[in-house]
Curated annotation (Swiss-Prot):
It is an enzyme of class 4 (lyase). The active site is at residue 520. Keywords: 2Fe-2S, Amino-acid biosynthesis, Branched-chain amino acid biosynthesis, Iron, Iron-sulfur, Lyase, Magnesium, Metal-binding. Homodimer. Mg(2+) binds at residues 81, 123-124, 494. GO terms for biological process: isoleucine biosynthetic process; L-valine biosynthetic process. It catalyses: (2R)-2,3-dihydroxy-3-methylbutanoate = 3-methyl-2-oxobutanoate + H2O; (2R,3R)-2,3-dihydroxy-3-methylpentanoate = (S)-3-methyl-2-oxopentanoate + H2O. The lineage of its organism: Bacteria, Pseudomonadati, Pseudomonadota, Betaproteobacteria, Neisseriales. GO terms for cellular component: cytosol. This is Dihydroxy-acid dehydratase. Gene3D superfamilies: IlvD/EDD C-terminal domain-like. Belongs to the IlvD/Edd family. [2Fe-2S] cluster binds at residues 122, 198.
Length: 619
């Protein structure tokens, strides 16, 4: 029987000093002996996805205390990728994932907490907390802040009278010379109307949905709007449930509630299957690989490639399809509706267990909104957007009169009526990316699934943006942005501005982009990232010359620099001959702080999840 970790600091004569300090935090005499549950919040006023979380930690804490445990809240950092986008701030985004994981490990282990509630929401916070959960392997539950409502705008030129939109529209239209300043301002003012993670299937929402598929959060976690009063119940339920599973582990020796027991290889395959089916962000591949690595699960790019070939795309939302947003996914039954359709097609391992059900099969049946007997599920997924600008959680209670149960033409479809039989994400291999690169196929127009073009080589995102806005890129070009990987950046910047600007120039279906960096969850188009090995690690993307021909073949999962093996070997030898200047950008002036240099010294390429490899500095 495992012993409560907290006894280390709450029991024994020698811990009198520690108990004195616990008392100073509000712990009463009768509390000693109760489990201590850490509540890791990520509230910040910098991020709309986190601005409403200031009271959420205490909401969970009070419920934990009612259930018979001690709750202690602390905070971790949260970076807004959208605000950090397009300048040097983006260098810090991915490294913050590891900093978040470390900070949670430090707090939980330093204070001997018995269990953990993770209150996350945006891009790197959920992955960072997942890494921490796997590392600590104590009872853990995730509850996120929820998605933002989609924006609405009326009267923008050359479109229907009213449309829904998101921050990506603001980025694209700001660079379109055909749209006036007034029209851009109107989009800007309406794109992000409420608190919450951005309204499409971008990275934040993709990751929060994946916590459901992994079995570490409650149904609705990924889709229940931040503004809806009903979401409050998820926080209260998380508070009650963490006490229950904590006692099951420490008092009944039930190891099935531990993160590593839940997030098995089967669970990772389920999560990736669901991700492919909903056309999630390519960042999810990076993060799932990192989380699996921390969990000690043998889940690799080859597994993702295998799944991507057999899983159809059955849910297609913004940025891949502007007919649907997260609020529509919720109305259609949320993540468990997607899981149900995948299960019907035999695409899931439903014998895995979750924190809230003995098996995934049980959970799918319980939360099936097509079953009229599941009134609790039907009521939860009728939650609708309020349509009022706000930064307040639980501020509206609007409900849909009906759910979207149309599995032929609705938001979520059955496999027979899939948006495409090819999944929403794919892994490509070839001489330019021997260990793979990734593309969100759900966002690629069918006309360019096969594409051959001329390489236009840039050694920084900034230079690429300057080239695109300076009209140096024409139809048929393939923009190569290298030395932007985890080590080469360092920090693996997102390339949302280059892809957005290609669209604003009318080149969204006429050009491709390949990088060893990564993309925002808001990216669509023929945007291929995570080229591994990265240029700074000796990857062949560093050997591409201006004007080379590159062939992309998504149906056959290949990408190729059209030169002979002998020529490629000669270029590699020439590069190696540069000595200390080899595998470094030739003409880039970029300040890199000590913190970023430390990350870059340990960073691995994207095919390994861009995790830190301490051995690289120990050698």
């Amino acid at each position: 029987m495992p012993e409560y970790r907290s006894k280390t600091s709450t029991h024994g004569r020698n811990m009198a000093g520690a108990r004195a300090l616990w008392r100073a935090t509000g712990v009463m005499e009768t509390d000693f002996g109760k489990p201590i549950i850490a509540v890791a919040n990520s509230f910040t006023q910098f991020v709309p996805g986190h601005v409403h979380l200031h009271n959420m930690g205490q909401l969970v804490a009070r419920e934990i205390e009612k259930a018979g445990a001690i709750a202690k809240e602390f905070n971790t950092i949260a970076i807004d990728d959208g605000i950090a986008m397009g300048h040097s701030g983006m260098l810090y985004s991915l490294p913050s994932r590891d900093l978040i994981a470390d900070s949670i490990e430090y707090m939980v282990n330093a204070h001997c907490a018995d269990a953990l509630v993770c209150i996350s929401n945006c891009d790197k916070i959920t992955p960072g907390m997942l890494i921490a959960a796997m590392r600590l392997n104590i009872p853990t539950i995730f509850v996120s802040g929820g998605p933002m409502e989609a924006g609405k705008v009326i009267g923008v030129a050359n479109i229907q009278p009213e449309r829904r939109l998101d921050l990506i529209d603001a980025m694209i239209e700001s660079a379109d010379d055909n749209i006036s300043n007034r029209q851009v301002e109107e989009v800007e003012q309406n794109a992000c109307p409420t608190c919450g993670s951005c309204s499409g299937m971008f990275t934040a929402n993709s990751m929060n949905c994946l916590t459901e598929a992994l079995g570490l959060s409650l149904p609705g976690n990924g889709s229940y709007l931040a503004t809806h009063v009903g979401r409050k119940e998820l926080f209260l339920e998380a508070g009650r449930m963490i006490v229950e599973i904590t006692k099951r582990y420490y008092e009944q020796n039930d190891e099935t509630v531990l993160p590593r027991s839940i997030a098995t290889k089967k669970a990772f395959e389920n999560a990736m299957t669901m991700d492919i089916a909903m056309g999630g962000s390519t960042n999810t591949i990076l993060h799932l690989l990192a989380v699996a690595n921390e969990a000690g699960v043998d889940f690799k790019m080859a597994d993702i490639d295998r799944l991507s070939r057999v899983v159809p795309c059955i849910c297609k939302t913004a940025p891949n399809n502007h007919d649907y947003y997260m609020e529509d996914v919720h109305r259609a039954g949320g993540i468990f509706a997607i899981l149900k359709e995948l299960d019907k097609a035999g695409k899931l391992h439903t014998d895995v267990h979750t924190i809230h059900a003995p098996t995934l099969k049980d959970a799918i049946e319980k939360w099936d909104v097509t079953n009229p007997e599941n009134t609790h599920a039907i009521e939860r997924f009728k939650a609708a957007p309020g349509g009022v600008r706000t930064t307040q959680a639980f501020s509206q209670n609007r409900m849909w009169k009906t759910l979207d149960l149309d599995r032929e033409k609705g938001c979520i479809r059955d496999v027979a009526h899939a948006y495409s039989q090819d999944g929403g994400l794919a892994v490509l291999f070839g001489n330019i990316a021997e260990r793979g690169c990734v593309v969100k196929t759900a966002g690629v127009d069918e006309s360019i699934l096969k594409f051959t073009g001329r390489a236009r080589v840039f050694e920084s995102q900034e230079d690429a943006v300057e080239g695109i806005l300076g009209n140096q890129i024409v139809a048929g070009d393939i923009v190569i942005i290298r030395y932007e990987g985890p080590k080469g950046g360092p920090g693996m910047q997102e390339m949302l501005y280059p892809t957005s600007y290609l669209k604003s120039k009318g080149l969204g279906k006429a050009c491709a982009l390949l990088t060893d960096g990564r993309f925002s969850g808001g990216t669509s188009g023929l945007s291929i990232g995570h080229a591994s090995p990265e240029a700074a690690e000796g990857g062949a993307i560093g050997l591409v010359h201006e004007g080379d021909t590159v062939e992309i073949d998504i149906p056959n999962r290949s990408i190729r620099l059209v030169i002979s093996d002998e020529e490629l070997a000669a270029r590699r030898a020439e590069m190696e001959a540069r000595g200390s200047k080899a595998w470094k950008p030739e003409n880039r002036d970029r300040y890199v702080s000590a913190a970023l240099r430390a990350y870059g010294a340990m960073a691995t390429s994207a095919d390994k999840g861009a995790v830190r490899d301490v051995a690289q500095i120990e050698r």
